[in-house]
Amino acid sequence: MTVKMYTLSTCGHCKSAKKFMGENGVEHHFTDVDLLSGDERKQVLDEVRKYNPGCSFPTILVGEKVIIGFNELAIREALGL
């Protein structure tokens, strides 16, 4: 299962989520939203708001499940770890 994460490059919780995925061998893709600009940034922020109206980070998509923030237990449950 591939995990999609919306993150900020300066966010400590986002860094923890990325580290967790790497340490557990979870295939994941992330987008550091703060490093985008212009229309691309607006488009990605609109996408984040679909899953997380508060637009907070990290926003993590595991299949159909949305996890807001770095919640290791919720991530483990969603991934079956």
Question: What do these predicted regions represent?
Answer:
Residues G22, R49, E77:
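Short polybasic/polar patches that bind polyanions
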Residues A74-L81:
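Thiol-/selenol-based redox modules, centered on thioredoxin-like
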